[in-house]
């Protein structure tokens, strides 16, 4: 598996269970002409909130940064819930 495919796999391995647990949706765009982006939302429709936005020129770096952002978001969510 090349670096790009491995980065995508690592992101989805982390993202899928977290998305199911918190009701997340992901939108992404990659292109050879401009920077790629990944946006992750909580909720659906008019009530959805963007919780993560990553932009990166290199697609492999994009997926790696998104993976780190998802992990960080879940950890902060767990900390907030633990304080309640």
Sequence positions of predicted segments:
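Short, intrinsically disordered, low-complexity terminal segments
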Residues: 2-4, 16, 43, 63-66, ...
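Hydrophobic alpha-helical elements and their junctions with loops/disorder across both membrane
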Residues: 14, 26, 73-77
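Acidic, low-complexity, intrinsically disordered interaction modules
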Residues: 20-68, 72
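Short intrinsically disordered terminal tails
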Residues: 1-6, 71-84
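Negatively charged, low-complexity tracts enriched in Asp/Glu with abundant Ser/Thr
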Residues: 1-25
